[in-house]
């Protein structure tokens, strides 16, 4: 009997190893002179060779239009925000639509919107310039958005258990705010600036029900006469826990939302260093004496620099070298071409 169980265990181990070994890595690039398996994500999705569990790397210099991720794969970009040179980064100059349950996207720059149409999607370390949306009226559950930069996250009324952690959600232009229509979601250790600036009123959260908001730094805009905009936090939101956040409202709101820190100002320099790079993490690091220090649950800091999914500078994927600078001369010198690469 003991030998039987040993054989069963060995068979299970071999099967697991076979599944791991079966997963393949693919490279996508359309940059001139770069050899790759496919010229676009769409082309990779159309290939019968690319299967569930594979990893697709988008190489430096790759510039694509709108793409659809239609298989349960992991798509890994180059990170974002560290260089203006097209030869050093990969970009999606359009929208990304995810239609495969269980797909994961890491370190990708998207100039448009990311439409999430299925359950169990993970976005990590991405910059989604024009916002993250639930792209369908069908129910979409268990989405995870970690350590990204975007302008808003908008779901529909049919979603549950989204996790939104350690993101920069900055200056959303939507009428109804930076976070919308979330149910039973966890919103934790984010920095949210909703419609910052004069005479820009947008709601911070609209129809966010049965959610948990904790360890965030939440800043609204100001009115046209410079007053702190008070009326549009957590509008039409019910049964929501709001605790251990730093919020740009007067302390008179303590009775409504006890256990938070109220700054009575939209001056973010009292909370953050406000120097250096946003993408690199310096700008939104906490300044000396910041009210966000130790203000989180368990006396951790509020904001994006702590926690299991703390903000990663430039959205760098793990174990992927970042090319900060690439200099290639137009012509050789003394029959040699000297290429300079800075990592």
Question: What do these predicted regions represent?
Answer:
Residues 31-34, 61-64, 79-83, 221-223, ...:
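Acidic glycine-/aspartate-rich tracts in secreted/extracellular proteins
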Residues 114-116, 133-137, 147, 152-280:
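Predominantly extracellular beta-rich ligand-binding scaffolds that present long acidic/polar faces
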Residues 24-63:
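Acidic Gly/Asp/Thr-rich repetitive segments characteristic of extracellular carbohydrate-active
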Residues 259-317:
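C-terminal accessory segments
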Residues 64-66, 72-116, 125-132, 153:
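Right-handed parallel beta-helix/beta-spiral solenoid domain characteristic of secreted/periplasmic
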Residues 1-25:
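Bacterial Sec-dependent N-terminal signal peptides
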Residues 302-337, 342:
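Short, compositionally biased P/S/T/A/G/V-rich stretches that sit at domain boundaries
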């Amino acid at each position: 009997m003991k030998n039987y169980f040993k054989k069963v265990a060995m068979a299970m181990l071999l099967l697991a190893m076979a599944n791991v070994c079966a997963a393949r890595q693919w490279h996508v690039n359309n940059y001139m002179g770069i050899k790759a398996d496919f010229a676009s994500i769409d082309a990779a999705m159309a290939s019968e060779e690319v299967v569930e569990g594979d990893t697709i790397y988008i190489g430096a210099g790759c510039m694509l239009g709108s793409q659809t991720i239609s298989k349960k794969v992991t798509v890994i970009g180059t990170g974002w925000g560290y260089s203006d040179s097209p030869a050093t980064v990969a970009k999606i100059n359009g929208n990304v639509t995810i239609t495969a349950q269980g797909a994961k996207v890491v370190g990708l720059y998207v100039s448009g919107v990311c439409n999430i149409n299925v359950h169990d999607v993970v976005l990590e370390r991405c910059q989604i310039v024009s916002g993250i949306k639930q792209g369908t009226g069908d129910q979409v559950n268990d989405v995870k958005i970690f350590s990204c930069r975007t302008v808003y996250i908008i779901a529909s009324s049919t979603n549950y258990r989204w996790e939104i952690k350690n993101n920069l959600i900055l200056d959303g232009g939507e009428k109804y705010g930076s976070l919308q229509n979330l149910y039973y979601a966890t919103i934790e250790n984010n920095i949210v600036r909703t419609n910052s600036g004069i005479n820009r009123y947008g709601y911070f959260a609209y129809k966010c029900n049965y959610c948990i908001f904790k360890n965030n730094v939440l800043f609204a805009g100001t009115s046209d006469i410079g007053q702190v905009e008070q009326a549009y936090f957590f509008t039409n939101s019910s049964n929501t826990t709001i605790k251990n956040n730093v919020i740009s409202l007067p302390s008179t709101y303590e009775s409504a939302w006890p256990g938070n820190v109220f700054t009575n100002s939209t001056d973010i320099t009292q909370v953050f260093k406000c120097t250096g790079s946003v993408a690199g993490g310096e700008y939104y690091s906490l300044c000396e004496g910041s009210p966000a220090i130790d203000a989180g649950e368990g006396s951790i800091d509020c904001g994006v620099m702590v926690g299991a999914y703390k903000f990663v500078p430039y959205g760098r994927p793990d174990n992927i070298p970042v090319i900060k600078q690439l200099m290639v001369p137009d012509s050789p010198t003394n029959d040699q071409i000297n290429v300079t690469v800075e990592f």
